[in-house]
From Swiss-Prot:
One of its GO terms (molecular function) is taste receptor activity. GO terms for cellular component: axon; dendrite; membrane; neuronal cell body; plasma membrane. GO terms for biological process: chemosensory behavior; male courtship behavior; sensory perception of taste; signal transduction. It is a multi-pass membrane protein. It comes from Drosophila melanogaster. This is Gustatory and pheromone receptor 39a, isoform B. It is found in: Cell membrane. Belongs to the insect chemoreceptor superfamily. Gustatory receptor (GR) family. Gr21a subfamily. The chain crosses the membrane at residues 33-53, 60-80, 123-143, 148-168, 225-245, 266-286, 349-368. Expressed in the adult labellar chemosensory neurons. In larvae, is expressed in neurons of the terminal external chemosensory organ, as well as in the dorsal and posterior pharyngeal sense organs.
Length: 372
């Protein structure tokens, strides 16, 4: 704990204020550490209580957000409501259980940041990520207010608890997406700085073997932090969040295809619900450019002229090791968190949406036959 660290992400330690972890940043010691207090523990208990109450409320009564005029749609809608609390509880539990690993990750990242003399505060993406999270919170606040007026007509306790759970889920899940995305951006920026340093080293007339070796060790350290440490902390979190996010997108697309939901007001409402969901579903995938950044190091080394010294063997060993590199970031091994997953993701969403529509058509056909 004696290593001085830079504050990598100015919003990362806000996890403690949202009841996710005890992560804190000491301004006097300049380190990330776990600082459990009665207030942080109380917030965590309240958050767990909210989701447990929302889950019990949804189990007590077969609720659905919107009447889909079909048993299939209502059943899936109810499943989405149940998944809201379950997946968020699991995501929170995962992050809470990995909080020590997160501190270790931040300390090691800080050491690499110091080594490469990288300035996190100079990266504008971090501020934009945080501002977008705040904006989405405001959008959902307005949407829930509009939706709640119609949904809470009878003020049933189960509906109130379910709606509160949904609001908490939107705030916490999107913040977890934001934290993960920010960490990926840091890794990507560190690789960019490392590539520039390597480019400078190999462009000199006399290439320093010790300098190149140190640069390649830094490269491996950055990739290792992503493949092991970052995924250990956030891999399970992203997996659980994706499950609900995909189900919610399927439900919204399904509702948009129902009769009576094609007015301009309905389309605007559907878009406002869908846009933030899709944004945070896509964001962790498109921001990951780590593999391409890592390949730049390999491409640069292939252009280094052979000298017949130990430098050649070191470069060949490095290139051989990175020849068949697996996806660097994954949802704990279930799928890659990069652009290659985008097509599969949207294919799955539209496939399951079509299946729901087909079940609804079969249900309507059965009802028509029974009338005769």
């Amino acid at each position: 704990m004696g290593t001085r660290n830079r504050k990598l992400l100015f919003f990362l330690h806000y996890q403690r204020y949202l009841g996710l972890t005890n992560l804190d940043f000491s301004k006097s010691l300049h380190i990330y550490w776990l600082h459990g207090t009665w207030s942080s523990t109380a917030i965590q208990i309240v958050v767990v209580g909210v989701f447990m109450a929302a889950l019990l409320g949804a189990l007590a009564e077969s609720l659905y957000y919107m009447e889909t005029k079909s048993q299939t749609g209502n059943t899936f809608d109810n499943a989405v409501i149940l998944t809201t609390s379950v997946t968020q509880l699991l995501a929170n539990l995962w992050l809470r259980s990995q909080q020590k690993s997160q501190v270790n990750l931040l300390q090691r990242l800080s050491q690499v940041v110091e080594l490469l003399q990288f300035e996190p505060y100079a990266v504008p993406q971090f501020r934009w990520l945080y501002r977008i999270w705040l904006l989405v919170c405001l959008i959902y606040g307005a949407m829930v207010t509009h939706f709640g007026i119609n949904w809470l007509t009878t003020m049933q306790i189960s509906r109130v608890l379910t709606l509160i759970g949904f609001v908490y889920r939107c705030v916490l899940a999107n913040f977890q997406f934001t934290c993960y995305t920010g960490m990926v951006v840091i890794l990507k920026k560190l690789l960019q700085v490392q590539v520039k340093q390597l480019e400078h080293l190999v462009s000199t007339t006399t290439i320093s073997m010790a300098g190149v070796a140190g640069c390649l060790r830094t490269h491996d350290e950055i990739l290792l932090l992503g493949q092991r440490e970052l995924i250990a902390v956030y891999g399970g979190v992203i997996l659980f969040l994706f499950i609900y996010q995909v189900m919610q997108c399927i439900l919204i697309f399904y509702i948009s295809n129902l009769e009576g939901f094609h007015s301009s007001n309905d389309l605007v409402l559907i878009f406002c619900w869908l846009a933030p969901m899709l944004f945070y579903l896509i964001l962790p995938l498109v921001v990951n450019d780590i593999h391409n950044q890592a390949n730049k190091t390999a491409k640069m080394l292939t252009k280094v002229p052979r000298t017949g010294t130990g430098l050649d063997r070191m470069i060949e060993k490095f290139l051989l090791k990175n020849l068949r590199q697996k996806p660097i970031l994954t949802a704990y091994g279930f799928f890659a968190l990069d652009k290659s997953t985008l097509f599969k993701l949207f294919t799955a969403i539209f496939t399951y949406m079509v299946i729901l529509v087909q079940f609804k058509e079969m249900e309507n056909s059965t009802k028509s036959i029974n009338k005769f």
